[in-house]
């Protein structure tokens, strides 16, 4: 299954706010109206919608998300929490959380076009897994910095999660640590996502 490129508002109306996909928000009560029209949700549908939330927010294909679930399942600790850590530490998501992009697809484009360096080297892989003490900078060229400055100016001021530090004037972000669960930027029940995949096998 390919990455979703359809109408974004249609997705947030069904699944709720997906800040990584779009800055738009569903109207208050729209999800309740949808639920009343379709009747009581089955447990399968509830798990499916949580999985879809995760997939659309982070901009992943079905195959990519399944791969992350399998990696998380082999790691120590809670599979759901490890899954969220893996997704949150992707380079495209780190740029989004720093405010250097308004959405994760936008952050992915910055990376794909060679505007972003990690520890002084250009990284053009959006799924690159950032680690504590990684330094993310914008390429020292006028077009790269003007592009990111415009995005920084356009992004709504939000408190940075505690695992990140932003030095705006240096066009630089620092990864301080692995993200805490409470700082994840999406309202999600990750256990339902793990359950969804465990029942598919």
Swiss-Prot record:
Disulfide bonds: none
UniProt cross-references to SUPFAM superfamilies, sorted A to Z: Alpha-L RNA-binding motif
Gene3D superfamilies xrefs: Ribosomal Protein S4 Delta 41, Chain A, domain 1 (1.10.1050.10), RNA-binding S4 domain (3.10.290.10)
Pfam entry (one): Ribosomal_S4
Region (Disordered): 20-44
Keywords from the UniProt entry: Chloroplast, Plastid, Ribonucleoprotein, Ribosomal protein, RNA-binding, rRNA-binding
Cellular component terms per the entry's GO annotation: chloroplast; small ribosomal subunit
A GO BP annotation: ribosomal small subunit biogenesis
GO molecular function: rRNA binding; structural constituent of ribosome
Domain (S4 RNA-binding) ranges: 89-152
Localization annotation: Plastid, Chloroplast
The family this protein is said to belong to: Belongs to the universal ribosomal protein uS4 family.
UniProt subunit comment: Part of the 30S ribosomal subunit. Contacts protein S5. The interaction surface between S4 and S5 is involved in control of translational fidelity.
Function (record text): One of the primary rRNA binding proteins, it binds directly to 16S rRNA where it nucleates assembly of the body of the 30S subunit.
Name the UniProt record assigns to this protein: Small ribosomal subunit protein uS4c
Species annotation: Barbarea verna
Gene that this polypeptide is encoded by: rps4
